[in-house]
């Protein structure tokens, strides 16, 4: 099938870096395998110009990798500040052959609730190759503001994401259809504040 072509990007990124607007959702896809620096201005432009109520980013490599020895520092140092700045709702990743869902809380203020968040991050796996979760590495990401919520090993997943008005529901199912994980983001569109349920 044909994927969108962003003519402002080099040809080597065509059909691998693009944005799709669907109803109230802006889905931005980046190519985390090559030309990372060239994609950073594109990401900021897409987020800055977004009129969508929900912004979702997807790329292959994990911003917060749960697998031992796998770390995508470029994304944390260059893309995460943009995800924070523009209050991106959900980031979907793969690559690490393990499962992890976590979030970045909003910057602490005296009026902030404990469940207020900036972004939910998901790393998942659907194929047979599986790695172990590195709990020490997950703990180290706390310095970047990341809070791990749930991990899994030796399990294949698929996901269903639904959006209804001010609620985005993410559900992870095992390959045999059993629900493993659920995260519900409730968003106040006037303030931009989000709660994780």
Please name every model-derived segment.
Residues 154, 162-164, 169-197:
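Acidic, histidine-bearing metal-coordination/catalytic regions of metal-dependent phosphoesterases
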